[in-house]
Swiss-Prot record:
It comes from Lactiplantibacillus plantarum (strain ATCC BAA-793 / NCIMB 8826 / WCFS1). The active site is at S108. InterPro entries: APS_kinase, P-loop_NTPase. ATP binds at G34, L35, S36, G37, S38, G39, K40, S41. It catalyses: adenosine 5'-phosphosulfate + ATP = 3'-phosphoadenylyl sulfate + ADP + H(+). Disulfide bonds: none annotated. Belongs to the APS kinase family. This is Adenylyl-sulfate kinase.
Length: 207
């Protein structure tokens, strides 16, 4: 691929701070990482709904959804996984610049890839949420039957079976969905956002 050097970044006349002021909340990336079936997407979508109910601008970037469009040309090799996360990191950065709280739900198995996304954002704009649900619990859920296929050898390079998952060393938030209900997990994330002054919230949505 030939890369062009004849490009220039064009600054907007509206700053990120001005967008945040208009929205009455800070923008940040909530990066949900964990094994398939750990509960990343479920929690991320529930948090988004809770934020929406309190008039907080937010959006979920889901791992499966992104592979329908932007990342449809990527597979699951180490190189493709790295590019997958790089692209999502760049999209998430644009969402943050737009003043939106951005929730990403990706296995993102490699620590270095997640760290690159963090480094590409401001210090307080990346919150790593480790959904630390045990492998056996994830396998018991296995709604998509992916673990079963991986165990039978029908899928190769599957994270947690024959491909590694590098757990975060010092995540901002750790959640084990095998030990608490969804409402508690959502409240845990909302509490973090409120306590660190990203948003002003009343309570989590328990519907």
């Amino acid at each position: 691929m030939v890369k062009s050097d004849n490009i220039t970044w064009h600054q907007s006349q509206v700053s990120k701070a001005e967008r945040q002021a208009l929205n009455h909340h800070k923008s940040v990336v909530l990066w949900f990482t964990g094994l398939s079936g750990s509960g990343k997407s479920t929690i991320a979508n529930a948090v988004e709904k809770a934020l929406f109910d309190q008039q907080v601008g937010s959006y979920v970037l889901d791992g499966d959804n992104m592979r329908f469009g932007l990342n449809k040309n990527l597979g699951f090799s180490a190189e493709d996984r790295e590019e997958n996360i790089r692209r999502i990191g760049e999209v998430a950065k644009l969402f943050v610049d737009a003043g939106v709280i951005t929730l990403t739900a990706f296995i993102s198995p490699y620590r270095a890839d997640r760290d690159k996304v963090r480094a590409n954002l401001e210090v307080d704009e990346f919150i790593e949420v480790f959904v630390d649900t045990p492998l056996e619990v994830c396998e018991q859920r296995d709604v998509k039957q992916l673990y079963a296929k991986a165990r039978r050898g029908e899928i190769t390079g599957f994270t947690g079976i024959d491909a590694p998952y590098e757990a975060p060393i010092d995540p901002e938030i750790t959640i084990d969905t095998s030990k608490q209900p969804l409402t508690a997990s959502v409240q845990q994330v909302l509490n973090y956002l409120a306590e660190h002054h990203y948003v002003s919230l009343v309570t989590a949505n328990e519907n």
